[in-house]
Swiss-Prot record:
Name of protein: Ribosome maturation factor RimM
Keywords per UniProt: Chaperone, Cytoplasm, Ribosome biogenesis, rRNA processing
PANTHER family cross-referenced by the UniProt entry: RIBOSOME MATURATION FACTOR RIMM
Organism: Ehrlichia ruminantium (strain Gardel)
Function: An accessory protein needed during the final step in the assembly of 30S ribosomal subunit, possibly for assembly of the head region. Essential for efficient processing of 16S rRNA. May be needed both before and after RbfA during the maturation of 16S rRNA. It has affinity for free ribosomal 30S subunits but not for 70S ribosomes.
Gene behind the chain: rimM
Record localization: Cytoplasm
Transmembrane segments: none
Chief site of localization: cytoplasm
């Protein structure tokens, strides 16, 4: 998919025998998953109805025209996208994960530190994985204003203030 689309979730497995599916959502609130309209995998458009919110990022859903477990199984690992223009406008200092991935990470002294590779959330906060400059190694840091002091999505960079515990002589 191109940058005009954002992945809102992925179908992880069938659920039951009636064609329901379990979906891992990437929305802040799983109940918002279907609020923006029909979703697509890039080929097919899906109308989805939430049956149950299972956890903070998992729902059980019914997809129109999917009526059996066999049909639902064919959708396993299918990513579901929405046009970015259908999403609500963000307030200042809010970002979609897809807008941050690929941004160059620059230290406060203007040295290049790396590139944002991926964003995770293990419960307490978002974690930014950074692929280190001129290396195959990566490191992870919490996504906070104290650490990522400036974010410029238009010019595709962030400014990183390394936490005191890490420092610039730690070998990262």
């Amino acid at each position: 998919m191109n940058s005009d689309f954002i992945c809102l979730g992925i179908i992880t497995s069938p659920h039951g025998i009636k064609g329901h599916v379990k979906i891992k959502t990437f929305t802040e609130n799983p109940q918002n998953f279907t609020s923006y309209g029909k979703l697509t995998d890039g080929i097919t458009t899906y109308e989805i109805n939430i049956i149950q919110v299972v956890s903070k990022n998992t729902i059980i859903a019914k997809i129109n025209n999917i009526t059996s477990r066999t049909n639902a199984e064919l959708l396993r690992n299918k990513k579901l996208f929405i046009e970015k223009t259908k999403l609500p406008n963000l307030i200042e200092n809010e970002f979609y994960h897809s807008d941050l991935v690929g941004l160059q990470v620059i230290l406060e002294d203007n040295n290049i530190f790396g590139t944002i590779k991926k964003i995770y959330n293990f419960g307490s906060c978002d974690i930014i994985e950074i692929l280190l400059y001129n290396s195959k190694k990566s490191t992870m840091l919490p996504f906070s204003k104290d650490i990522f002091t400036h974010i410029n999505t238009k010019e595709r960079y962030v400014i990183l203030k390394l936490p005191e515990i890490i420092g610039s002589n730690s070998g990262i």
